[in-house]
Amino acid sequence: MAENNTDTKSSNQMWGGRFASGPDAIMEEINASIGFDKKLFAQDIRGSIAHATMLAHQGIISSDDKDKIVHGLNTILSEIESGNFEFSRQLEDIHMNVEARLATLIGPAAGRLHTARSRNDQVALDFRLWVKEELQKTEQMLTGLIAAFLDRAEEHAESVMPGFTHLQTAQPVTFGHHCMAYVEMFGRDRSRVRHAIEHLDESPIGAAALAGTGYPIDRHMTAKALGFREPTRNSIDTVSDRDFAIEFLAIAAIAGMHLSRLAEEIVIWSTPQFGFVRLSDAFSTGSSIMPQKKNPDAAELVRAKTGRINGSLIALLTIMKGLPLAYSKDMQEDKEQVFDAAESLELAIAAMTGMVRDMTVNTARMKAAAGSGFSTATDLADWLVREAGLPFRDAHHVTGRAVALAESKGCDLAELPLSDLQAIHSAITDKVYDVLTVEASVASRKSFGGTAPSEVRKQIAFWRARN
């Protein structure tokens, strides 16, 4: 798709009747959006076909003119898709580029297409259609990522690993349980996507510049033809609204935050010091100087790209925050933010899905790490509550003394002699050792949503039925 950036002055703009001369070259440059909004060509043509069809149905244009318009628009669509369309910066945007080419192809009938329509509702339609399609794509990609985590969770429902708080060993959990935490996160992201699709499922076409139109149009007809639930209800709000774009960016930013947290864990877990996972060669790179290196670049790039998404959200919020109602040219700056964020999110989800599916999990290393750092200390405290009748705060204090003793002796809690434990509290018996293994700790956490393998499998079944 070629782009003509010739800087000669022109007075052939579609709005040029009121002007005696063409715009300055700098004005053309700052005013033009064709460099990025050409991405909307399919939505623009689809909307124009629906609009022309409605105009003919309502008797506003002739069926003959409608047929010429539709044929011409389909020709333009083929030209753009095949790379044989020359975009012109002097024509500003995708709407004017398409209309100018249509005039060349079919003559005066092209001038009837813009009846009862403004670029204000036209761009709102194109952009809304594009965001709706992108949300649908995001929903599918999140479903794939959730499926990847469900598979790993099922595979590792009993694989013990350390659970962390403050990145310090806390309690044993299973890797399957940890995977299911991300299923919950990305499930919420997908739910937000679905709600966003519902929110934007209204057709803006027919709002015209801001006040509606005096032509007897049928907005319900175009809404149905374009796959919307219904038309928007207020023409001023229709051309003012970019909530749908901001909501997309907010959803992308939240999903990006989840992806970034996952990326951070993968980066940490893949270090030799942790050694919990090993990324496949397909999602790793090497060093130009250090032959031994296998770097988690895919995870690091996911972590970085999510920062770009945050920037896009803040940029569009800032663009929109001071605008009076209806259309202002500031709103032209909305699309690049959304396009860039959408591309970043797609790449991040795709890369993370591949990493999760392909990575090798070192269950032996995880289990060994789970047994360090006194991870079963809470189990000792709980045993004292259940078996010795201590209040939890007293049990917490007794356990803290046991941890301090084990630390001073360089051993784990389960390795302390019974005499040492009884010296701390006389109610402790040899039965306490039954709860001090990581396997026993994990198996005991049977509360709803807990880390016990039986609970993890219930949650997997729940999500399998909904994915």
From Swiss-Prot:
GO molecular function: argininosuccinate lyase activity
Top-level taxon in the UniProt lineage: Bacteria
Recorded metabolic or biological pathway in which this protein acts: Amino-acid biosynthesis; L-arginine biosynthesis; L-arginine from L-ornithine and carbamoyl phosphate: step 3/3
Membrane-crossing segments per the record: none
InterPro entries xrefs: Arg_succ_lyase_C, Argininosuccinate_lyase, Fumarase/histidase_N, Fumarate_lyase_CS, Fumarate_lyase_fam, Fumarate_lyase_N, L-Aspartase-like
Enzyme Commission number, as recorded: 4.3.2.1
Reactions catalysed, as given in the entry: 2-(N(omega)-L-arginino)succinate = fumarate + L-arginine
One of the Pfam families matching this protein, by short name: Lyase_1
The encoding gene: argH
Record NCBIfam families: argH
GO cellular component, one term: cytosol
Organism from which the protein derives: Rhizobium etli (strain ATCC 51251 / DSM 11541 / JCM 21823 / NBRC 15573 / CFN 42)
Subcellular location: Cytoplasm
Designated name of the protein: Argininosuccinate lyase
GO process annotations (BP): arginine biosynthetic process via ornithine; L-arginine biosynthetic process
Gene3D superfamilies referenced in this protein's UniProt entry, alphabetically: Fumarase/aspartase (C-terminal domain), Fumarase/aspartase (Central domain), Fumarase/aspartase (N-terminal domain)
Record bears the keyword Ribosomal protein: no
Enzyme class per UniProt: lyase
